[in-house]
Amino acid sequence: MEEIQRYLQLERSQQHDFLYPLIFQEYIYTFAHDRGFSRSILSENPGYDNKSSLLIVKRLITRMYQQNHFIISPNDSNQNPFWARNKNLYSQIISEGFAFIVEIPFSIRLISCLEGKKIVKSQNLRSIHSIFPFLEDNFSHLNFVLDILIPHSVHVEILVQTLRYWVKDASSLHLLRFFLNEYCNWNSLITPKKASSSFSKRNQRLFLFLYNSHVCEYESIFVFLRNQSSHLRSTSSGVLLERIYFYRKIERLVNVFVKVKDFQANLWFVKEPCMHYIRYQRKSILASKGTSLFMNKWKCYFVTFWQWHFSLWFHPSRIYINQLSNHSLEFLGYLSSVRINPSVVRSQILENAFLINNAIKKFDTLVPIIPLIASLAKAKFCNVLGHPVSKPGRADLSDSNIIDRFGCICRNLSHYHSGSSKKKSLYRIKYILRLSCARTLARKHKSTVRAFLKRLGSEFLEQFLMSEEDVLFLTFQKASSTLRGVYRSRIWYLDIISINDLANHKSKF
């Protein structure tokens, strides 16, 4: 227990003072809108709209200096001049200033790590693109997975308390608490489906930063406790990607020394099931080679961990235990599972013949066709049954522009789902988009689809129908013709377009 406390104290020792005066500096709000400065500290947000000016900031600072405007009661909160007419505008400016200021301590730590002044403790963090090869290399060797939905209904006070571990400037934290309590409907700010107000859309950077800091606090403690429970240190998040057969070698080592009595106590720790942890946004998975009982213990541990350490109700139904050979895992826009392929080998020794049945595990990724059709139906490309319809809103565009837009959507979907094991399910999506494009053009020219295609021919859709196989062939024209067969296998692209939207099936078609 003392070692855990020392670890937490070490992590929280890098605290920074005197952030409160920065709130009243005009240049802070200018920097918050300067994309060049934001890019230098790796915190660029392309969703910014530059609407602040020195005049607005001066008025804001003047009103913030008047402390009587911060005395708000439930009866006169709507009549307070500070939050009255320009409430959304002021909240946007304050939120951007807060987001910029509270990111300063984290940016300093990040820059110092990049310059080699400090050992990076978050060495297990990886880009989202590393998740796909990690799943492909490791999931075929695993048995069970915990599908976890991280709680998002976090109380504002818990978020402020989490931030206090890193920033001990009481004045700025009090002002932040006041700002959050005045505005915050936390469920609508974190959950994108409910974020319909202009305030929620404009101030997501601050609230997402607070929520991510809360999740980071949970993960840092969880990973530390996990590493203390085994002799295999820090094996999560794909650190050992280049050592795919590492655990097979360990099992081989166990078989070699199994007859040695002195190794019995140590071998129990070595043979402990390996745990892999991956998180993307609000969803995380914990996979292992262990048994169902072993995963149930981890499920109980997660529930207790969230409830006692973070004072947050965490219902057990938010954690699902799935066996990879029987269930599919929905993650990052794919349905992932482990398929068992039976293989029969005939062996003959002299006059005796034997049939040996081998079960080969293979990582399988499928395209979730039903959610994709639902997204297309929501965007009015088809109905709920998947029958294509025209897009009246695009009938005013030129023919080439209409084809380019439909083709871009089709190529993005094909590009993202190129890692699928079975690409035949994408043909239906291409059919919906192709026929929807044809019906939109026919409606524009007041003709039928058949007559329109017969008059113009099918060549005008060649760019629209270009598949990933053709893209590979055009990219590597000097390579052998056998390269076309590469398309039949799984391909993970590292330049995925609109990965966040496609991973959540919320693409803005």
Curated annotation (Swiss-Prot):
Cysteine disulfide partners in this protein: none
Top-rank taxon: Eukaryota
Location within or outside the cell: Plastid, Chloroplast
One example GO MF annotation: RNA binding
GO CC aspect terms: chloroplast
Keywords recorded for this protein, A-Z: Chloroplast, mRNA processing, Plastid, RNA-binding, tRNA processing
A Pfam short name: MatK_N
GO terms classed as biological process: mRNA processing; RNA splicing; tRNA processing
Main location: plastid
InterPro entries: Domain_X, Maturase_MatK, Maturase_MatK_N
Family according to the record: Belongs to the intron maturase 2 family. MatK subfamily.
Record function comment: Usually encoded in the trnK tRNA gene intron. Probably assists in splicing its own and other chloroplast group II introns.
Listed name of the protein: Maturase K
Source organism of this protein record: Ibicella lutea
Gene name, Swiss-Prot/TrEMBL: matK
